[in-house]
C-alpha cells in the first residue's frame, strides 16, 4: 500500500466504496488521515464499517465544513450528465474533489528515494482503445529484461494498493478518461496517448470533453517523454502542441496507418514491420507478423506504443523484439480460444465500441461475426468500411433486432450467446474465423465485458 501524504489529521470524505473507494480509504488511514465514507449501497457501507471506517451521509453544504477534500470513485459522475448530489455539495462548499489517481501522484515520491541509485518512474497510458494491451506489453517487456516493474490502475492492482516502489522500479498505469478527468495531480514521467474514438460521451459532454479528459495527462508542464498516436486529428494536434519543433524528440509520434517522416522521433508499423526513425535515419526494424500475441494491425499500434516507451526508458531494440515474441496477449482481446476443422474462434469481447470492433474485423479475412449489446454514443459509422471480410453477423442482446438493422452486412438475430455460437459454428467453413467483437457495451445481458467473453468461451468449448 502507498500511504497518502499531506493529509495527516485531516478529515477526507470518500464517495463510493467499491474496490477503488476502499483502496483510497485504507491508504488515507495509513497516511494518518481520517476517512469519512459513504456509499448508497448498504452492503458496501456494512463492509466498510467492518473494517472500522465511519460511514456518514453528506446531505448539506454545512456537512463539508470540516472536510479537507472529497475522493470520488471513477464510476460516479462529477460533471456530466449531471454531478452526483454529494459531489455537487462539495463543489458548492468549495471543497476540492479528487480521486485515487490524484492521491497516488501526490504520494508516490518519498524521502526513501534519497537512498536510491535510480529514481522510480511512472509510465501512464491513456486512449480510447489499446490501453490495456499496451500497458500489459510494456510491463511484460520490462519484466522480460529483469527490470522491476508493477502494473496498476485500470488493469492489475489499484494504484494505492501497490507497494512503495523499489530502486529503479517502473510503475505502469493504465488510466481511463474517468480517472484522468478528475485527478488533481497527473505527473507521469512518460505518458502515452494511443488513439481517440467516440466513447463515454455521456460522461464527458461530447467529443471535446472526452479529448480534454485524455489530454490532461500531458498537462502540468508535460511528461519528460510523450508517446502520441497520430492517426487521428486529435493525436496529431496533441503532438504538435507538445513539441517545441519538428526535431523535438521529447515527443515520439507513432502510427499503424502511415509512414512517418521528419527529423523527430517516429515509430510506425507498415505491412507488418515496425520501424523506428530518429533524426531522419532508420534505427531499427521489427517483424511483427510472427508475434503470436499481437494479431491484427490494431495490435501493431499497441506494439509501436510499447516499443517507444521502452526505447525511451533505455532498452535496446533487439531486447524489445525478443520480449515481444513471448507476450501471450490479454484475455478478451483478440484471444484465440480454439480451432476445429480449420475454423478459428476468437474472443475480442473488449471491443465495446464501433471503432474497436472495426479494428478487430480488419485482422481476419473471412469472419462469422458475433456482435450486439448496448449501443454506445457515437453510432456505428466506423463499421461501414470495415465489414468487407464479414461473411455474416450473428446479433445478440436485448435490442438485437434494432442493432442488426444498422449493420452493413447480412445479419441473423440470435439474442443469446449460445444461439450465436451454435449457428456461427455450424455455418462456418474451413478458413473462417468466428469472432466475438460486440461493438457495444455488455450491460444489457452481462455484468461486464469479461463475463460476456467467458460466456463465449464456454459456448465455444462445447463445440470444440
Curated annotation (Swiss-Prot):
Transmembrane intervals: none
InterPro entries: Mur-like_cat_sf, Mur_ligase_C, Mur_ligase_C_dom_sf, Mur_ligase_cen, MurD
Subcellular localization: Cytoplasm
Pfam families in the cross-refs: Mur_ligase_C, Mur_ligase_M
EC number(s) given by UniProt: 6.3.2.9
Biological processes per GO annotation: cell division; cell wall organization; peptidoglycan biosynthetic process; regulation of cell shape
Pathway note: Cell wall biogenesis; peptidoglycan biosynthesis
Binding site for ATP: 127-133
Keywords assigned: ATP-binding, Cell cycle, Cell division, Cell shape, Cell wall biogenesis/degradation, Cytoplasm, Ligase, Nucleotide-binding, Peptidoglycan synthesis
Record GO cellular component, one term: cytoplasm
Key word Nucleotide-binding present: yes
PANTHER family: UDP-N-ACETYLMURAMOYLALANINE--D-GLUTAMATE LIGASE (PTHR43692:SF1)
Entry protein name: UDP-N-acetylmuramoylalanine--D-glutamate ligase
Organism: Roseobacter denitrificans (strain ATCC 33942 / OCh 114)
Gene encoding the protein: murD
